[in-house]
Design a protein with these regions (language model features):
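A structural signal for short beta-strand/turn segments enriched in small hydrophobics and glycine
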Residues: 8, 14-16, 65-77
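Short glycine/serine/proline-enriched coil/turn segments at secondary-structure junctions
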Residues: 7-8, 81-84
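Short, charged beta-turn/beta-strand-edge "cap" motif at the junction between a beta-strand
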Residues: 22-24, 74-82
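Short acidic/polar mixed-charge low-complexity motifs
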Residues: 6, 46-48, 105
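A structural micro-motif recognizing beta-strand termini
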Residues: 1-6, 43
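Acidic, glycine-rich catalytic/binding loops that coordinate metals and/or anionic ligands
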Residues: 63-66, 91-147
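Zn2+-dependent peptidoglycan hydrolase active-site motif and core
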Residues: 11-64, 86-87, 91-94
Length: 147
């Protein structure tokens, strides 16, 4: 968990794919597409999609199609969408359609191995794990399980 308001930075250089600036999640509907609240996704220069959600704010300059650099501020940790505590949901996945495939975008490989390595300054790429997942699953057109 991270404290509310903690800066969220780009994990890699790349192009912004999606930005959600309005929290439309409703517990009565519980739609998977809106569970992340305020969120962003980036297609990294490594060909991997990175996703962050539950933010309280996203920087105005962060827009689809904009190039970001590793370490660039994207927003602030919050508790929008389907959550009660402040935290950043961080997903790593293949780019697939690039937009609209929330069931993939929210992450298909466990991110901690990479987050821990990056925190220590070790350049560890999730590319092989993401490629292995995609070889097995492809790019599903709908959620594989009940969201």
């Amino acid at each position: 968990m991270a404290a509310c308001g903690t800066a969220v930075i780009a994990p890699v250089a790349g192009i912004v794919l999606e930005v959600t600036r309005t929290d439309t999640w409703d517990a009565k509907v519980n739609a998977g597409a809106t569970r992340g609240g305020l969120s962003w996704s980036i297609l990294g220069d490594d060909g991997i999609r990175y996703y962050g959600s539950h933010l309280s704010a996203i920087e105005a300059a962060i827009q689809p199609g904009v190039r970001v650099t590793a370490g660039q501020r994207l927003g602030k940790v919050g508790r929008t969408g389907d959550t009660t505590a402040c935290h950043l949901h961080f997903g790593i996945s293949p780019a697939c359609t690039g937009a609209g495939d929330w069931w993939i975008r929210r992450g298909v490989v466990w991110p901690w191995t990479y987050l821990d390595a990056w925190r220590k300054g070790t350049p560890k790429s999730p590319a092989s794990a993401v490629s292995a997942w995609q070889r097995e699953h492809g790019c599903p057109k709908k959620p594989l399980t009940n969201p």
